[in-house]
C-alpha cells in the first residue's frame, strides 16, 4: 500500500543527496548542516543493528527488534527503509513530519532505493545526484581514504555503475570537482526550492 501525504506550502522540504561512495556526500551534508540559513535537520534513524557501547538510544539511533521494525513497516511508520548486512535501517515518519511541520528542512544522505520510497510518499522534495569528475578521480578518492582494499574498491565501483543508471530519478545532477562550488550550488538549489 502506498500512503501519500498532502503537504501545505508552509511545510519544509526533504533534500535527498545521493551518489557513489567516495564522491563526498558526507562532507557536503556536514557542511550544508552548518549553514543555519538553510534550516536543515537530520533525522535519527531506526535500526535493528545491535547498539554499540558508545551509542545512546534516541541520539544515535532508535534501536528496534526485527519484529518491532517490521511492524513499523507494516504500519507505514517509515519514510524509507533498507536492509543492509542483515539489519534494517529506516527514517521514522513521525520525526520527518515534526521537522517539516516546523517549516524546516530535512536532509538525507540516501541511496537510490530510498529515494524511490521517499518520492512515493508525496512530500516536497529536492533530489540531487552527486557525481565525481571521472571514474579515475573516484578511485583516487576511495584509495585516499585508506579504509578500503582493492576488492572493496572494485565492489564500490560496480555499485557506482548501478547507482548512475538511476540518475534520471533526480531533479539535479552535480559534478563534485570543486567542493566549495558544489556546496554553493546545492545551497542555491535549496533556497530556490524553498521560495
Swiss-Prot record:
Source organism superkingdom: Bacteria
Positions of ATP binding: 19-26
Catalytic activity line of the entry: GMP + ATP = GDP + ADP
Residue runs in coiled coils: none
Primary enzyme class: transferase
Gene Ontology CC: one annotated term: cytosol
Pfam families for the chain: Guanylate_kin
EC identifiers of the protein: 2.7.4.8
Location, primary (coarse class): cytoplasm
Stretches that traverse the bilayer: none
Record's protein name: Guanylate kinase
Gene source species: Mycoplasmoides gallisepticum (strain R(low / passage 15 / clone 2))
Amino acid at each position: 500500500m502506498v500512503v501519500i501525504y498532502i503537504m501545505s506550502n508552509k511545510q519544509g522540504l526533504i533534500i535527498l543527496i545521493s551518489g557513489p561512495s567516495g564522491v563526498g556526500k558526507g562532507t557536503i551534508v556536514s557542511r550544508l548542516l552548518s549553514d543555519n540559513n538553510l534550516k536543515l535537520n537530520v533525522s535519527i534513524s531506526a535500526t535493528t543493528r545491535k547498539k554499540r557501547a558508545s551509542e545512546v538510544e534516541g541520539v544515535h539511533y532508535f534501536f528496534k527488534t526485527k519484529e518491532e521494525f517490521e511492524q513499523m513497516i507494516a504500519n507505514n511508520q517509515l519514510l524509507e527503509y533498507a536492509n543492509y548486512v542483515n539489519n534494517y535501517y529506516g527514517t521514522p515518519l513521525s520525526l520527518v513530519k515534526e521537522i517539516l511541520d516546523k517549516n524546516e528542512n530535512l536532509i538525507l544522505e540516501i541511496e537510490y532505493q530510498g529515494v524511490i520510497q521517499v518520492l512515493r510518499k508525496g512530500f516536497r522534495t529536492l533530489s540531487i545526484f552527486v557525481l565525481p569528475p571521472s571514474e579515475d578521480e573516484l578511485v583516487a578518492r576511495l584509495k585516499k581514504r585508506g579504509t578500503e582494499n582493492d576488492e572493496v574498491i572494485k565492489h564500490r565501483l560496480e555499485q557506482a555503475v548501478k547507482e548512475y543508471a538511476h540518475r534520471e530519478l533526480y531533479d539535479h545532477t552535480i559534478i563534485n570537482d570543486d567542493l566549495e562550488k558544489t556546496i554553493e550550488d546545492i545551497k542555491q538549489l535549496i533556497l530556490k526550492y524553498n521560495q
